[in-house]
């Protein structure tokens, strides 16, 4: 079966170097940590991975989580109160939505990637103490990329922080795959990044928040998913360290991804399919019919190609089926 719908963007989930690194780390450090980070769940390997992620994103510090859902769920409540404002893209991931709900800050929502609507929200939020703009780097259902340069321009104009979830963009977009800040040259203008080790970076599990040191320090003290969840297991740490080592050695994996995405898009469009144009690796094949999408998926699986049809329960109610 050929898998066409996993988030294994760089093909690392079954790479022999990662498998070997994971096995070797378990041989040395065991299967699990049996503790949260602040008791006895922090080893040198956790700090080493946090440093590798900081280096990759050109940030000051990083905090690891069990999943990016935890990173997004645990970032807002420790940092913002009823005096503040969170301004969130309407198509942000469910983990961001849930994280915002846990926080007492005033909430604003702007239409997907609509900079005029974002500016309206920023203007309305000027009375709040702190403001933060929150967006996915790549929106997972259609592959659209957030216009980070314009978002950062507005953030600077209206004195707001910026947070981006790089789950579907890190390892994928940008000249060398370093994400939306590389694509739009917004290094130093984004205050908080969240991301996952479960997509381009190996495909297993684990999440992180990376950014300014004072923000990460505060999260270490107050972020509940970090404080009350077991540390990432040594096998995950070992493989993840190998991922960042490989990405530093060569851009070959990203170059191959770009080649494959371009080939797929070109061939599908030449065959008459409607594919949304994006700069990401997500290729949404639009069928505009829920039943037809399920028929296509079933027939493809019968032919040995694994795909999934998405429709209203998983995507925005106004969006067509893919």
Spans of features found by a protein language model:
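Active-site phosphate-binding strand-loop segment of PLP-dependent enzymes
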Residues: 8, 108, 112-164
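Conserved PLP-anchoring active-site segment centered on the Schiff-base-forming lysine
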Residues: 75-94
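PLP-dependent aminotransferase class I/II
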Residues: 201-268, 273-276
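Residue-level detector of conserved catalytic or cofactor/ligand-binding positions
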Residues: 312-322
């Amino acid at each position: 079966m050929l898998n066409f719908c996993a988030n294994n963007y760089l093909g690392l989930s079954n790479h022999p170097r990662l498998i070997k690194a994971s096995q070797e780390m378990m041989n040395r450090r065991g299967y699990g940590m049996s503790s949260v980070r602040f008791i006895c769940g922090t080893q040198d390997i956790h700090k080493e991975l946090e440093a590798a992620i900081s280096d990759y994103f050109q940030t000051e510090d990083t905090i690891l989580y069990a999943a990016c859902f935890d990173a997004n769920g645990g970032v807002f409540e420790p940092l913002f109160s009823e005096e503040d404002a969170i301004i969130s893209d309407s198509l942000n991931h469910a983990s961001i939505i849930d994280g915002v709900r846990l926080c007492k800050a005033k909430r604003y929502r702007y239409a997907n990637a609509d900079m005029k609507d974002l500016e309206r929200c920023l203007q309305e939020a000027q009375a709040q103490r702190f403001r933060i703009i929150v967006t996915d780097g790549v929106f997972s259902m259609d592959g659209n990329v957030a216009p980070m340069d314009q978002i950062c321009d507005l953030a600077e104009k209206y004195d707001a922080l910026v947070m981006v979830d790089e789950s579907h963009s890190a390892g994928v977009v940008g000249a060398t795959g370093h994400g939306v800040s590389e694509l739009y040259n917004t290094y130093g203008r984004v205050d908080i990044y969240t991301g996952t080790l479960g997509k381009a970076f190996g495909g297993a599990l684990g999440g992180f928040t990376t950014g300014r040191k004072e923000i990460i320090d505060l999260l270490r003290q107050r972020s509940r998913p970090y404080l009350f969840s077991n540390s990432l297991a040594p096998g995950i740490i070992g493989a993840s360290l190998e991922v960042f080592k490989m990405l530093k050695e060569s851009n070959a994996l990203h170059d191959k991804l770009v080649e494959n995405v371009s080939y797929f898009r070109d061939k599908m469009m030449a065959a008459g399919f409607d594919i949304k144009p994006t700069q990401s690796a997500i290729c949404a094949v639009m069928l505009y019919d829920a039943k037809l999408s399920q028929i296509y998926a079933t027939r493809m699986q019968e032919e040995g190609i694994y795909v999934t049809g998405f429709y209203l329960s998983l995507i925005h109610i106004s969006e067509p089926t893919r």
